[in-house]
Structures are given as structure tokens and as C-alpha cells.
């Protein structure tokens, strides 16, 4: 017979359906259309399964039933979890009048929840049938209460006597959201069907009787109702109801759509664990329930496993193991370490597709005590399969099952070796749980075997399923087993037929032994008794124990005869022992050591590896006594008692020991003397060397080779500063637009003033002083510089005012008016500024377009030194511990290994150029910052901007090489972009560039600065610090503020440590400058090196005041141009003439020599030393960005709130949960910010920036 391992639920008893106590639940079958294994007992099998059952946890399969079969045991069924199959029956009616719902958790042929097939009389089509004979077969469905099929369709075919299947409104029965709802039925009948009863509305019925009218609960409902009890809008059922209801509440449902919780329909069962929001603890929920099928139960039924998630299951999930409690309940428990290996049977894991035990898989069960799965022995097991190369199973191979104690599935045997008279290879099998049932019904099946007895003497439990034993013509002892004691629920039973009659067994003496209690046994002999009437010795029943006579002597414990210890002396008139241990003897057979009987006294025996050996001897009474001498080693000489003899030392041994000791002492003395002498020689040599060096030194040593940092820091008075307008505010303090009026001078200098808030922590003051130290030491026209510092109670940094804001906002605002010359000039200037920082050994770490300020449309400066770090003279790289960093601008080694070098700044420079060429687009927009490292390692880079030629884009790509040494140096970038700036339209292609306006001279932020009337009559900060009076005019008044700009522009820009630099620009009242004229400072990047070298004809027409900033730096700090450039980056003759470059035909007349002394230039290799009084954080990083008590790190990026311009100390609402837009620091989890009362402008936090203190 073909075998299929079907996983089915066992027989159960639990509370399930709404409003009913003691609802009986039973399992279904899974045989489909196969013939029953035992047709003789098939009806009995169904009766045992469904007698009194109300909920079928599985499939209801009614097949191959005769015409006279009594099916009254089906009348209580109300719910079927799987599908319902009525096929190949000859009965006229199936009494399922109470069936309400078919859930369709399993479907027949994967489509149908209800299948009625071939229920006909074999003589139905025979024309010679006897007249007046009523054909057999199903005549009516009579499913009068069926109002819901949740999933699956209907299949009705081959039922010639069946009526009314087409009178049913199946649309009302099938659920609206039922995706698999085909209705496939034929109406071919061999008889005429009466009409439905007149009381049936719309002529819908299940049978001829008025009680069989169809109850409609779906199609008659008003809009929005899934089920209802009537046509009125108030008749709607609760949304958790299925099959209809008696009222609107979820306790009025006829069946539950999801789960039934004590008569109330719920979407989920109550969780076992709840969260207490008051105590922040997880607590046991006293109302928690386990999920079992469509019901909520307090405990899982027997033979089911409870899980931590609150479900009842048959198989534990991965990384869990079965645990049986003392009360017999079973649960799945998570393994604290890798779960121990288990033995899997058929239907599980790698044996899921195996049909039977064969010679190929039997060795997997060697040594197994518990098998998770089933065992099946088919004829092919012992015949083999030559086509697949499987050898026949030999009988001796079955000995591997002698250690087996438990099977979680079923045991099926339809073939067995003829030489075996029983199943004694399973003599130690105690439990067959039946979590997996054969045909969905049987946990033990024995059929067609030649055995004479069962031999399962240790079997004590069949946890679920029926036992089927039939067609075993030689088998006796079937009825001598107390099967009721093995079963665990009332639906279990033994089905047997075709076995050897008991009378024939009795005639041959195949009966239970007389020592078997109640005549219960598994086979002949005293070893096959279920229980013994007298005593049990091992596995054998005996009349008495060997307490007084016989060897070995025994003692009695209950009804078990247990042997005494072998060292116990047998007694004739009393018990020999009262236990099985050596210290439980009445007398010893040999010797007694303490309280235990021993065969011999311990002689040199170590009771434990860590103890000394013990020596004992027996006295006259046989009691072990300790020896006078306890030898520990070399115990060779023993006396007559077996104790160690006294050892006398030999003179040779003494002499050898003395000589060896003396030699060792002499060697140690010599070694110590040598070491002392060498130590004195080294001290003498070092002393002489030091004295010689002290006499020969004539000048101080400079081991590092670093030149002193002679940068100057201006200390300003608070009375010299005048604050006009708030530019930004944050957690650390406020940035103001202001004026610096030096004492004793009639000048006004526009500045940006950063003021720390009150009660600033000492660490915050130290960090801002560190930033001031870095800014004060720079000296490049392309790097923002510090003007001074005011040491009031709240430290104030004073920086240059920049009128156009940051470069990022500038290119976004004027993207339609920027030319290729503008973009390339900015690239050159940024590269020169970074090249200068490389020379002074300063790693910027935060280069981006937002950190480049625009002094004029032709002049930009690098700023934001909040993350910048100086390298010592012997350092080439910097390793950071954490803090805020811009992930999308950083090199890969900086993200992964926190390694920052000048070459990592080259990577950031490439991203900055990309921002310019895309007019302020966001790099890697839409990609989370956490994915950036993997994206870069896979080779992905930013795409080529539309306006860039391949020449410009290849420079960007070189900046983004994984190997930092393969990236270009900044001096090389200066050279490359300077070459491109001479022919800009060849390398940057902008549509309609020639038709567009000139470079923008105005900005939104510039106009905002014009609102203040006090900004007139001002002097540029750089002109004041490095005056060039008398260069073009001997009149010193030209250097004053009288001829300075009358109207000014300013913008606020984010600066790394709180720096905000602003500058000046002529107003619209002044006449327009020549395109060749520089604007405040270094001017356009067409000026390379000394800005006073190489003056063209256009420069000669400028006023002395306009050209004075050009003479501020005597030498370009990055890379001097070759002589033939004459100090300019001019376009080639074939190129159009853009702004800011000299005309090709204009040649410089004569070089101009600055009359004033140029500012000191730091030589190459010079470094900016850290001040000894300032102690940065780890590795020089000042990473406590929350030290100021808030979450906004750099308020310069924040626009001031409306209405705060007139307030010197604005206090807008500030949420500490927000941070700077471009950075995200994860160090906040390690140290919380101190309480702060300061309120600043909120900004959104950008999650695309991560801290480096957590691996990316």
C-alpha cells in the first residue's frame, strides 16, 4: 500500500466555539480519494473520530460509505477548519445540518473547500434494474446551516441522484474577499427533483423540506456589511463575525472570522507578555492566551508544544528544543547555546521525501533515543530497489532501534522479516506521540505481518491517533494489551480485524504468563508482562526476590528486586543489604574502609588527582587502618603489611645534592657580578657623552625643525565692538553683524562677532580658543582669517564680514547667471587655499561648497575650521575618535578607519567641484549615509555633471580614487584648473552663456545687510590690517574710510567652529567697475601669485583705493606661475573673452612694485604649533560638540527668525532634538548634553551624516 507521511493534528479536547462550554475538538483525515487502509473498520474509524465532535481541526472526509451506514455521529459538527469531501458514497443523506462554516485552511486539489464527487449507485445506469427499486446515492446536501466558506470554491460532479445544488445561492455562502472561489458543478440527474418549499424566499434551498431553506447572510446586507442577520441597516454583524450573527456585538457571532476568545470574536488572542508603561517593564499578562487553530486557549492541549510567542504547535521553531515539565506539559524553549543534534525521522528535514526505512538511511538512527518524525517499513524496505541501487534491508540492521524510546510521529509496519516472530527490536520504545498521523488518523499501524506477538513490552503511551492492527494471520496477544491505558483522549481506539483468533492462540499455549497482572501482556513469557503480579527483576516477572537465598542477594523496593553491592557479605538469617551502594551492606565480604565495603585496602591510591596517595593496611578484624608512613613517590619497598618501608637516605645522594647546590650558587654569583659591572660601564659612558655634548653646544637645538609660529592675535576691547544685527544663533551663542571701531582711530570696520552664551562650560571656551588659534595662524587670500578676540565673560570671536554668504547658496541663487569662467576661477582659488593649508600642515576635514564664503563674485575664501586639525612636524595623518563628520564628502579611508590626511581633503575637493558644476546639487541625494561606504567600495561615484567635459570630470574621478596616493596633489589641481581657466568654454559648456548676463553682483543676503543705515562709511578689514597707503597716491587720506564703500552687502555662512566671515562690495551708487578690475581682496582667480605683478592696461585706469587690496600678499602661498603667465590666467586667443580675464591683445606694460612691506610669508614646511595651554580632546580632536548645552552646533547656517533683528539676544524656541543640517554625531548616546536654557533657531537633522565613533 502506498504510504504518505501526512502531518496532522492529534485528538484534542478544548474550549473553542462561541458561547459553548466543553466544545469537543477532533482531528480530521487526509486520505483524499484513496481507498481506506481497512475497509472493514473504516466506518468505525469515522465513528471514533467524530462521535460528539463539534469542531474538526483538519479535513472532514466522508468516502466509500455503504448505503446502510449510520452517520448520526456527524450531526454535532459545526465547523471544519480544512475542506469537506463527500465522495464515492452510497448513502442517501449526510446529517450535517448543524455545519455553519468551512474555513478552507486546506483545499481539495488546492482549489475547493467543498467537494461532492461520484456519490452514486453502481446500478444507477443499468437499464435492467428491478422495477420499483430506488437507486442508491446522495440525494440531498441538507447543509441548511452552512452560511460561510472563507476560502476555496465548490466542486459538485457525478451525483445523478443529487438535487438542489443549483438552487443554492453560492454567492452568499462564499466570502466576498475569497480569492479562490470557483463554483464547478453539474446538474445531470437521473431523477426529477421537487421544487423548493414555498416558504423559501427567492427559491433558494438545500433540500425539499421547509427546514432546508437557505439562510442568506451576505447578499441581503446593506452596503458595508460583510454578514448580517436581516435586511435592515441595524442588522449588520460585527466585523469579526463569520457565518452570521444574532446581534451587533462581537459576542453575538455564530462563528468567528479570526479567533474565538471565550465566546468573543477577536482579531488576535491576548498576548502572554504586556508592557507596563509606568514601570517600563515587561510583565506576564494574566489574561494572556495561546493561539490554537482559530481559538484562544489558556493552555495548549495535550501533545501540543507551547511557544514563547503564544502559539500551540507540533514542531518547535529553529534554535528551540522540546522541554517536558514535571507536570507533563510540553513547550519549546530557546537553546542557550547551539541546540544539540537530534534524530530526524520520515517526513522531517532531509528525510521529508523518504517513503520508508531502507538500507540507505537506517544507520542515521543508530544510538537514537528519540526520533523527531515517523518510521515506516514497506515491502520495498526489505526487497530493495535495483533501479535506484538501494540494497535490501537486512534483519540485523534493525538492531539500531533497540535504544529507541520515543517517536514523535507514527509507526507504520506493513512488511517485516520472516525470521522475526515479534517487534522486540522496539522493546525499549515507551512513547508514540502521534503528532504526525498516517492518513491523518493512525499513530500505530501493523498490517499483513507474519509475527506471532507484538513484543512492545515498554510501550506506555499512544499520545494521539488510532491504532490499526489487521490482516496479521499469525498474530496473537492483540486483546491482551490494555489499550485504554495507552490512549490519552476519548477519541482514540484500537481497530483490529483479520488477526489470529484468540481460541486458536490458546490452543497453542500462546497466552500471557501466570505472573502477568490481570492477564495483560505483549507476548508469551514472564518478560512480556505489562505489569507483574508479584515482583519484577529487571524486565522479568518473578515470584520472589533473592533476599534470603540465591545469588546475588537482593533487596526489595516496591515491587522491584534490586541487587546488593558485590562487596556485601551474603546473610542467611537476615537481609544482606538495604541498598545498592557499598556503604549499605550489613556485613562486608572482604574489608571495610570507613563505612564502605572494599575488595582491598587502598595502597598508594589517590582518591583525587589533586590529593596525596593514601596507604592503608587491614587489621585483624578486616578494617583498613592508615600506615605509619605515608609515602608520596618512589614507594618501591613495602613491608609485610603492604605499607611503605622506612626510606634511609644514601650518602651518594647527599654528596650529589651538595655539589649541585654549590655549583648553582657559584654560577648565580658570577652572573650577578657581570651584570653589575656592565651597568656601571654604561652609566660611565652615558655620563661622558653628556658632558662632551654640553661643552660642544654653541646654539639651541631644534629637533623638530619646525619654525616658530609668529602669528599675532589681536585682543579687542568690548567697547571697540558694536553689535548691529543678529545673523544667527545656536546652542553655543549668537553671531552678530557688527562694527569694529579701534580706539583712537576714526575708522569703522564691518565684522562678524561670535558671542558665547552665558554660563558657558570651560570646555566650550577652550574649544573656541582652539579654533581661534587655527584661524589666526593662516595667511592666504583664499583662506578666511581671524581679526581678533574679545576676552569678556563670554568669549567673542571677531572675523571678517563676507557679503555674499556661502558659495553653495551663491551658485544656487545665481545658477542661470554664472559662466564657465566663474566656476573655473572658483575651483582654482579653492585649490590654492587648500594647497596653502597643506603647506602649513593643516588638515581641513570639512571642505564643501557650504564652507567656502564669497567675498565678491570674483573672490572666494575657505572657512569653517571647526573640524580642522594641525599635524605635528612628524605626523602625516590624523586619526579621529568620533564627532560630527560629513559622510558624503569624506574619503573612504576617513569613513572606515577615521584616517584624515591632505589626500582625504582632495577627495572632499572633488565633491566640492561637483557641487559647483551641478549648481549646488546634493551629492548622493536620496541615498542613506550608512550605505555610502558599500557604494564607494563597489566602485560607484558621483555622475558627470551635464556642463562638464570629460577633462573636468576625469579630474574629479582622480580625486575619488580608493588609493589616496593615486589622487592628485593640490598643487597639481591648481595647475590643471588654471590651465582650464585660460580657455573656460572649452572645458565647461553652459548653454547660451554668451547671451546671458554678466556675473551676479547681488544676492538676497547682500540686500538684507543694506537695511542697516549704520553700515556706511566703512573700511575693509584687510585694508585696515595691511594698509597700502601711498602706493598709488601719496595722499594718506585715500586709505581712510572716507572713500570706502558707502553701501555694503553681507551674508551669513556656516563656519566650522562658529566662524562667520563677511566682506564688502561697492554699492549700486558707485560707477560700475571694469570687468578686469579686481573686487576687494585678491579679486578673481585670474590673478595668480602676487596680485600686484603684471598690471594690464585696464588696471591702470583703476583708482588707487580699488587696487590696494591687490598688493596685500607679496607671494602666492601655493604654487607660483611660470614667468610667461605674467601673473594672469588669461584665455587663449581662440576663446571668447569672458569676464575677469585680460583681453588677449592687451599686454602688461610694466610690473608694479609694492612700496609697502608685504606681510610675512610662512616658509614651506612651516607648521602651526598648538598652544601648550590648550588641551584638545583625544588625538587633538575637540569632539564634544554638545558642550554648549544644546544640539545646534553651528548657528551660522541658520537664518535668523523674523522679528529678532532688533533684539541683541534673541530667544526663539529651540528644540535640543535638532542638529545641524549637514552633520550627525552619534556620540550623543555616550554623553548627554548638559541642561540648557538657551533657545536657538531650530534646524532639521540630516540622517545622511553619521558619527565616526560607530562602525559604518
Curated annotation (Swiss-Prot):
This is Receptor tyrosine-protein kinase erbB-2. Residues 1-22 form the signal peptide. It is found in: Cell membrane; Cell projection, Ruffle membrane; Early endosome; Cytoplasm, Perinuclear region. ATP binds at residues 727-735, 754. The modification Phosphoserine is found at residues 1055, 1079, 1084, 1108. CDD domains: FU, PTKc_HER2, TM_ErbB2. The gene is Erbb2. Pfam families: Furin-like, GF_recep_IV, PK_Tyr_Ser-Thr, Recep_L_domain, TM_ErbB1. InterPro entries: Furin-like_Cys-rich_dom, Furin_repeat, GF_recep_IV, Growth_fac_rcpt_cys_sf, Kinase-like_dom_sf, Prot_kinase_dom, Protein_kinase_ATP_BS, Rcpt_L-dom. A motif (Nuclear localization signal) lies at residues 677-690. The modification Phosphothreonine is found at residue 1167. Residues 721-988 form the Protein kinase domain. It is a single-pass type I membrane protein. Belongs to the protein kinase superfamily. Tyr protein kinase family. EGF receptor subfamily. The active site is at residue 846. Disulfide bonds join 26-53, 163-193, 196-205, 200-213, 221-228, 225-236, 237-245, 241-253, 256-265, 269-296, 300-312, 316-332, 335-339, 343-368, 476-505, 512-521, 516-529, 532-541, 545-561, 564-577, 568-585, 588-597, 601-624, 627-635, 631-643. The lineage of its organism: Eukaryota, Metazoa, Chordata, Craniata, Vertebrata. Residues 23-653 are extracellular. It comes from Mus musculus. It comes from the Eukaryota. GO terms for biological process: cell surface receptor protein tyrosine kinase signaling pathway; cell surface receptor signaling pathway; cellular response to epidermal growth factor stimulus; cellular response to growth factor stimulus; ERBB2-EGFR signaling pathway; ERBB2-ERBB3 signaling pathway; ERBB2-ERBB4 signaling pathway; heart development. Residues 1196-1198 are annotated as: Interaction with PIK3C2B. One of its GO terms (cellular component) is plasma membrane. GO terms for molecular function: ATP binding; coreceptor activity; ErbB-3 class receptor binding; growth factor binding; identical protein binding; protein heterodimerization activity; protein tyrosine kinase activity; receptor tyrosine kinase binding. Its EC number is 2.7.10.1. Residues 675-1256 are cytoplasmic. Expressed predominantly in uterine epithelial cells. In the muscle, expression localizes to the synaptic sites of muscle fibers.
Amino acid at each position: 500500500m502506498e504510504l504518505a507521511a501526512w502531518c496532522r493534528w492529534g485528538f484534542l479536547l478544548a474550549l473553542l466555539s462561541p458561547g459553548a462550554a466543553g466544545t469537543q475538538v477532533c482531528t480530521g483525515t487526509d486520505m483524499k480519494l484513496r481507498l481506506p487502509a481497512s475497509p472493514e473498520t473504516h466506518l468505525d474509524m469515522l465513528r471514533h473520530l467524530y462521535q460528539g465532535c463539534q469542531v474538526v481541526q483538519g479535513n472532514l472526509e466522508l468516502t466509500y460509505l455503504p448505503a446502510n451506514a449510520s452517520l448520526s455521529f456527524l450531526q454535532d459538527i459545526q465547523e471544519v477548519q480544512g475542506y469537506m469531501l463527500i465522495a464515492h458514497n452510497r448513502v442517501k443523506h449526510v446529517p450535517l445540518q448543524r455545519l455553519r462554516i468551512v474555513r478552507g485552511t486546506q483545499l481539495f486539489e488546492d482549489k475547493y473547500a467543498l467537494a461532492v464527487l461520484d456519490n452514486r449507485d453502481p446500478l444507477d445506469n443499468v437499464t435492467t434494474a428491478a422495477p420499483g427499486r430506488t437507486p442508491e446515492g446522495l440525494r440531498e446536501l441538507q447543509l441548511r446551516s452552512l452560511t460561510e466558506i472563507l476560502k476555496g470554491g465548490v466542486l459538485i460532479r457525478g451525483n445523478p441522484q443529487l438535487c438542489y445544488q443549483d438552487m443554492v445561492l453560492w454567492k452568499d455562502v462564499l466570502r466576498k474577499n475569497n480569492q479562490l472561489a470557483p463554483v464547478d458543478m453539474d446538474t445531470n440527474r437521473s431523477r426529477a427533483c421537487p421544487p423548493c418549499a414555498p416558504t423559501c424566499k427567492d427559491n433558494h434551498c438545500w433540500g425539499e423540506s421547509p427546514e432546508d431553506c437557505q439562510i442568506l447572510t451576505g447578499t441581503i446586507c446593506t452596503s458595508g456589511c460583510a454578514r448580517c442577520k436581516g435586511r435592515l441597516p441595524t442588522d449588520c454583524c460585527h466585523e469579526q463575525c463569520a457565518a452570521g450573527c444574532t446581534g451587533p456585538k462581537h459576542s453575538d457571532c455564530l462563528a468567528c472570522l479570526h479567533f474565538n476568545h471565550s465566546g468573543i470574536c477577536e482579531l488576535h488572542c491576548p498576548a502572554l507578555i504586556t508592557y507596563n508603561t509606568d514601570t517600563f517593564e515587561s510583565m506576564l499578562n494574566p489574561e494572556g492566551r495561546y493561539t490554537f487553530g482559530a481559538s484562544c486557549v489558556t493552555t495548549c492541549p495535550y501533545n501540543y508544544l507551547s511557544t514563547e510567542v503564544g502559539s500551540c504547535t507540533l514542531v518547535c521553531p529553529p534554535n528551540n528544543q522540546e522541554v517536558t515539565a514535571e507536570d507533563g506539559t510540553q513547550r519549546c524553549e530557546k537553546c542557550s547555546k547551539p541546540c544539540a543534534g537530534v534524530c530526524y525521522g520520515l517526513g522531517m528535514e532531509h528525510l521529508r521525501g523518504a517513503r520508508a526505512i531502507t538500507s540507505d538511511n537506517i544507520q542515521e538512527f543508530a544510538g537514537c533515543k528519540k526520533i523527531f518524525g515517523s518510521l515506516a517499513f514497506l515491502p520495498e524496505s526489505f526487497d530493495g530497489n535495483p533501479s535506484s541501487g538501494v540494497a535490501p534491508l537486512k534483519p540485523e540492521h534493525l538492531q539500531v532501534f533497540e535504544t529507541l524510546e520515543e517517536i514523535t510521529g507514527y509507526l507504520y509496519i506493513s512488511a517485516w522479516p520472516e525470521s522475526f516472530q515479534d517487534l522486540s527490536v522496539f522493546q525499549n520504545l515507551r512513547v508514540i506521540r502521534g503528532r504526525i498521523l498516517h492518513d491523518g488518523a493512525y499513530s500505530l499501524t501493523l498490517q499483513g505481518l507474519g509475527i506471532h506477538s507484538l513484543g512492545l513490552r515498554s510501550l506506555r503511551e499512544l499520545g494521539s491517533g488510532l491504532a490499526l492492527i489487521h490482516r496479521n494471520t499469525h498474530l496473537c496477544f492483540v486483546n491482551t494489551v490494555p489499550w485504554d491505558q495507552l490512549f490519552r483522549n476519548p477519541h482514540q481506539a484500537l481497530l483490529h480485524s483479520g488477526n489470529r483468533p484468540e481460541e486458536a492462540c490458546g490452543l497453542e499455549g500462546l497466552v500471557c504468563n501466570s505472573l502477568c497482572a490481570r492477564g495483560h501482556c505483549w507476548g508469551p513469557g514472564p518478560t512480556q508482562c505489562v505489569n507483574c503480579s508479584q515482583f519484577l527483576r529487571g524486565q522479568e516477572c518473578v515470584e520472589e526476590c533473592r533476599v534470603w537465598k540465591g545469588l546475588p542477594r537482593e533487596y526489595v523496593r516496591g515491587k522491584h528486586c534490586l541487587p546488593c553491592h558485590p562487596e556485601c557479605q551474603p546473610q542467611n538469617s537476615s537481609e544482606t543489604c538495604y541498598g545498592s551502594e557499598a556503604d549499605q551492606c550489613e556485613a562486608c565480604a572482604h574489608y571495610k574502609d570507613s563505612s564502605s565495603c572494599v575488595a582491598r585496602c587502598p595502597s598508594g591510591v589517590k582518591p583525587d588527582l589533586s590529593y596525596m596517595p593514601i596507604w592503608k593496611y587491614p587489621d585483624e578484624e578486616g578494617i583498613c587502618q592508615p600506615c605509619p608512613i605515608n609515602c608520596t613517590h618512589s614507594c618501591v619497598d613495602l613491608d609485610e603489611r603492604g605499607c611503605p618501608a622506612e626510606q634511609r637516605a644514601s650518602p651518594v645522594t647527599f654528596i650529589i645534592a651538595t655539589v649541585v647546590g654549590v655549583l648553582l650558587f657559584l654560577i648565580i654569583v658570577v652572573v650577578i657580578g657581570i651584570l653589575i659591572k656592565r651597568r656601571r660601564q654604561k652609566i660611565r659612558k652615558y655620563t661622558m657623552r653628556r658632558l662632551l655634548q654640553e661643552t660642544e653646544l654653541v646654539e639651541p637645538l631644534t629637533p623638530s625643525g619646525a619654525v616658530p609660529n609668529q602669528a599675532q592675535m589681536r585682543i579687542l576691547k568690548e567697547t571697540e565692538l558694536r553689535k548691529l544685527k543678529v545673523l544667527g544663533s545656536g546652542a553655543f551663542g549668537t553671531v552678530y553683524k557688527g562694527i569694529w571701531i579701534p580706539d583712537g582711530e576714526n575708522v569703522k570696520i564691518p565684522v562678524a562677532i561670535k558671542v558665547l552664551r552665558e554660563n558657558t562650560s570651560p570646555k566650550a571656551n577652550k574649544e573656541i580658543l582652539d579654533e581661534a588659534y587655527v584661524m589666526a595662524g593662516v595667511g592666504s587670500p583664499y583662506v578666511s582669517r581671524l581679526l581678533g578676540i574679545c576676552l569678556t565673560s563670554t568669549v567673542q570671536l571677531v572675523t571678517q564680514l563676507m557679503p555674499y554668504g556661502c558659495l553653495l547658496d551663491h551658485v544656487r541663487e545665481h545658477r542661470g547667471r554664472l559662466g564657465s569662467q566663474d566656476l573655473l576661477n572658483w575651483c582654482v582659488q579653492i585649490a590654492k587655499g587648500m594647497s596653502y593649508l597643506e603647506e602649513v600642515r593643516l588638515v581641513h576635514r570639512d571642505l564643501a561648497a557650504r564652507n567656502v564664503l564669497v567675498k565678491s563674485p570674483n573672490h572666494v575664501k575657505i572657512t569653517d575650521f571647526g573640524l580642522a586639525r594641525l599635524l605635528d612636524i612628524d605626523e602625516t595623518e590624523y586619526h579621529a575618535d568620533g564627532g560630527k563628520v560629513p559622510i558624503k564628502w569624506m574619503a573612504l579611508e576617513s569613513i572606515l578607519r577615521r584616517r584624515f590626511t591632505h589626500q582625504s581633503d582632495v577627495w572632499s575637493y572633488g565633491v566640492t567641484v561637483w557641487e559647483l558644476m551641478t549648481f549646488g546639487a546634493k551629492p548622493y541625494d536620496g541615498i542613506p549615509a550608512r550605505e555610502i561606504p558599500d557604494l564607494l567600495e563597489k566602485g560607484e561615484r558621483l555622475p558627470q555633471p551635464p556642463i562638464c567635459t570629460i577633462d573636468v570630470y576625469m579630474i574629479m574621478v582622480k580625486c575619488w580614487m580608493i588609493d589616496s596616493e593615486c589622487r592628485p596633489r593640490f598643487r597639481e589641481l591648481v595647475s590643471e584648473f588654471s590651465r582650464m581657466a585660460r580657455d573656460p568654454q572649452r572645458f565647461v559648456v553652459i548653454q547660451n552663456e554668451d547671451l546671458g548676463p554678466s556675473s551676479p553682483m547681488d544676492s538676497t543676503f547682500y540686500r538684507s545687510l543694506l537695511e542697516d543705515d549704520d553700515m556706511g562709511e566703512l573700511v575693509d578689514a584687510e585694508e585696515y590690517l595691511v594698509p597700502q597707503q601711498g602706493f598709488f597716491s601719496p595722499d594718506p587720506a585715500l586709505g581712510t574710510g572716507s572713500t570706502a564703500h558707502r553701501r555694503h552687502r553681507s551674508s551669513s555662512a556656516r563656519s566650522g567652529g562658529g566662524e562667520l566671515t563677511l566682506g564688502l562690495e561697492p554699492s549700486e551708487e558707485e560707477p560700475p567697475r571694469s570687468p578686469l578690475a579686481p573686487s576687494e581682496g585678491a579679486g578673481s582667480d585670474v590673478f595668480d601669485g602676487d596680485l600686484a605683478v603684471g598690471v594690464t592696461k585696464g588696471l591702470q585706469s583703476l583708482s588707487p583705493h580699488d587696487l590696494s587690496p591687490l598688493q596685500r600678499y607679496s607671494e602666492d602661498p601655493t604654487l607660483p606661475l611660470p614667468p610667461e603667465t605674467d601673473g594672469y590666467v588669461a584665455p587663449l586667443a581662440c576663446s571668447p573673452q569672458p569676464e575677469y580675464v585680460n583681453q588677449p591683445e592687451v599686454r602688461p606694460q610694466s610690473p608694479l612694485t609694492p612700496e609697502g612691506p608685504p606681510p610675512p610669508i610662512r616658509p614651506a614646511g612651516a607648521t602651526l604649533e598648538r598652544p601648550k595651554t590648550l588641551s584638545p580632546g583625544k588625538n587633538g580632536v575637540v569632539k564634544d560638540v554638545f558642550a554648549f548645552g544644546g544640539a545646534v552646533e553651528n548657528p551660522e547656517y541658520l537664518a535668523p527668525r523674523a522679528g529678532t533683528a532688533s533684539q541683541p539676544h534673541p530667544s526663539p524656541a529651540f528644540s535640543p532634538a535638532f542638529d545641524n543640517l549637514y552633520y550627525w554625531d552619534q556620540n550623543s548616546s555616550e554623553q548627554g548634553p548638559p541642561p540648557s536654557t538657551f533657545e536657538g533657531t531650530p534646524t532639521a537633522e540630516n540622517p545622511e551624516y553619521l558619527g565616526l565613533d560607530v562602525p559604518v
